[in-house]
């Protein structure tokens, strides 16, 4: 097969490309340039798309003896990821830009161009697995073997078409073994730290970034009784479950910490309350994305609402026609925010199966 190896410049994508070469595929490495502003991504950033990352990716491809290219997706990245991130915070949501990047850039845009150029699949270093059922039907996307690094959640926004053209060669291996393999292969990235930063906010100051792009949109912080506590500069400064940075001088009547429990972007009102006020028992989601067309109606499954969060059993009521679903949780979850992805899993001894996802649009206690 002719495959594109998506080279982030990290150790995982390096080993993924190496394994694809060893498997006999015709491999071409490609690094995605997602910013035209060299100052927007610092060399010290633990992101995934700096100039240093591009150089690391090139060195790996040179070591493997495969072609290497840099593709400029900066315009599409700005529109589909950065602008979406800003717009979501402006309406009181808490988006995950890495999921949107996977959905719109790393798979959709990359795969679209790759197929147009005659490639059969995209190879990445994600910790997830693809398995084929005995009947030869659609493949299953499963959790990676290394549960500490499992990335199936951030792939839950992909559709059947993308999954059919993906390869995840490192998903059946734990991270320490990946580093050992990289070192044995002579890759300079063998000990390179994992990426954590939002790549377009390399200093980690999300509030300052949003303030620059959204500007001042004053509103009020109130408590559960509606008492005004102070003015704020904009709802983009807050997320559900936030405790730090509220800057409320008057303590709560019961002396307990306050948390952001609701954000109303239309009125600019941020409501704070107790930790118990964060508990939800029902999740509503829209913008559904399922890997199998038969996913409709009701089923019992599990849901995960954060990239490194736990799972909770739930009863899902899926309406594909309305593009909505309701999840009744077996146990409450805390701090669930609109804009997060609710990824559904089917428990399985061979590795939990990703069913699909929706974007959280509301909750109930």
From Swiss-Prot:
Catalytic site positions: 101, 199
One example GO MF annotation: tRNA-uridine 2-sulfurtransferase activity
Family matches, as CDD domains: MnmA_TRMU-like (cd01998)
InterPro entries according to UniProt: MnmA-like (IPR004506), MnmA-like_C (IPR046885), MnmA-like_central (IPR046884), MnmA-like_central_sf (IPR023382), Rossmann-like_a/b/a_fold (IPR014729)
Positions of the UniProt region annotated as Interaction with tRNA: 149-151
Keyword ATP-binding included in the entry's annotation: yes
Superkingdom per UniProt: Bacteria
One of the GO BP terms on file: tRNA wobble position uridine thiolation
UniProt keyword list: ATP-binding, Cytoplasm, Disulfide bond, Nucleotide-binding, RNA-binding, Transferase, tRNA processing, tRNA-binding
Signal sequence region: none
Primary residence: cytoplasm
Cysteine pairs bridged by disulfides in the record: 101-199
Location(s) in or outside the cell: Cytoplasm
Catalytic activity, reaction form: S-sulfanyl-L-cysteinyl-[protein] + uridine(34) in tRNA + AH2 + ATP = 2-thiouridine(34) in tRNA + L-cysteinyl-[protein] + A + AMP + diphosphate + H(+)
Site (Interaction with tRNA): 126, 340
GO cellular component: cytoplasm
Family: Belongs to the MnmA/TRMU family.
Protein function: Catalyzes the 2-thiolation of uridine at the wobble position (U34) of tRNA, leading to the formation of s(2)U34.
Protein name per its UniProtKB record: tRNA-specific 2-thiouridylase MnmA
Organism listed in the record: Corynebacterium efficiens (strain DSM 44549 / YS-314 / AJ 12310 / JCM 11189 / NBRC 100395)
